[in-house]
Amino acid sequence: EACAICLIWSTVNNVHEKQLGEWLGDALPDLAITLSHQLNPILREYRRASSTAIDASVKPAMQKHLLDLQDDFRKKGFEGQLLVSSSNGGCMDVEAASKRPIHTVRSGPAMAPVAGKACAELERCKGPIVVVDTGGTTFDVSLIVDGDISITTETWIGERFTGHMLGLPAVDARSVGSGGGSIAWIDDGGLLRIGPQSARARPGPACYGTGGDLPTVTDAAVVLGYIDPNYFLAGEMKLDRGAALKAVSGLANQLKVSVSEAAFSILTVSNESMINA
């Protein structure tokens, strides 16, 4: 589906890298190809190779999604410029994003500090600002000092050192797998873990009643009564506390504790992960 090409000295002489790209393009015209010297022309080859591989891996899906989105807007009469948020806190043209989709990989977490800065300015808050963004899969936290959003080149997809280095400038937002849909599980050593696997929106937490049967952070909150199952989303969505109890009970049996104790442990570990972010 895709190919990443990274030769060690292509930033000095890109002839061989370009030639490989041309050969592959001729032989496989539908193949998504990323050349490292075009994407991230730096001497540090590990960072360059990592960013090239990430870009190539997301390119087939992102190109189709972004270009289809643009076509849909055009068909509906939209004549403006369609922009996509980027990992460095800015925006880029949708066609540019489809050619270099890696720049959108951390665009979600990057927008929280941008919004946080804007809100702080409206409130005339001048002190350091901690911005928190939590969803179904991750808990993201960033810091704004003196009105400046911190940018880093040390961003990892997944765990630091064991995940994949982005290798490009991005907003410095720390992410941990402690979202509402993060799944609680027991590792080989018998310790309780949260995430990074998530139930996501579908099938979702067990209490959603949409097919999920694994214990999540949201299920634990429902079991303990922290979330009112009858007034979720202002009453627009009813949650199934029985399903949440059943999901958490499986974990409780493994830990040999009560369901309430297991639910409390899930939230405790989740909260500790957020604090350590």
What does each model-found stretch correspond to?
Residues E1-A277:
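N-terminally biased helix-coil "hinge/interface" segments that flank
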